[in-house]
From Swiss-Prot:
One of its GO terms (molecular function) is RNA binding. Homodimer. Viral suppressor of RNA silencing which binds specifically to silencing RNAs (siRNAs). Acts as a molecular caliper to specifically select siRNAs based on the length of the duplex region of the RNA. Belongs to the tombusvirus protein p19 family. This is RNA silencing suppressor p19. Residues 1-20 have a biased composition (Basic and acidic residues). GO terms for biological process: symbiont-mediated suppression of host innate immune response. InterPro entries: Tombusvirus_p19, VP19_sf. Pfam families: Tombus_P19. The keyword Ribonucleoprotein does not apply. Keywords: Host-virus interaction, Inhibition of host innate immune response by virus, RNA-binding, Suppressor of RNA silencing, Viral immunoevasion. One of its GO terms (cellular component) is virion component.
Amino acid sequence: MERAIQGNDAREQANSERWDGGSGSSTSPFQLPDESPSWTEWRLHNDETNSNQDNPLGFKESWGFGKVVFKRYLRYERTETSLHRVLGSWTGDSVNYAASRFFGVNQIGCTYSIRFRGVSVTISGGSRTLQHLCEMAIRSKQELLQLTPVEVESNVSRGCPEGVETFEEESE
């Protein structure tokens, strides 16, 4: 069950919640361990006057299968190397394996969610559409993380995200 987090509760939750830490679980879809910031790191990187601000050290993502939810906080430095690393935090195979542990005869709901710098994306579907859900989740994750302004110098030129068209104004 999810609860709304308001005001100072966000900091308290970040300190107490470890986001299902560890990568050794045989049922977790994640292949990287939890990288939640310590209380000291959280305080150093967040504005005390705006406790609803996301921690800029990384992002949160989760996979839910029925009532079971697996969560991770991953560090992301907004570099190509870091992007490549976090895109490998789960694969279609690891998600399928984890989900299969909770499937019975009936279809269950499956949900992927990611939150980065104040933007949340959630994708839901039934267990029979899990492959399509994984494909949409990886595209959403790539677009969300790549659309972030690059805060380090980089020679990499970023084009328009897939599905976005640019138009030039015609001069009269």
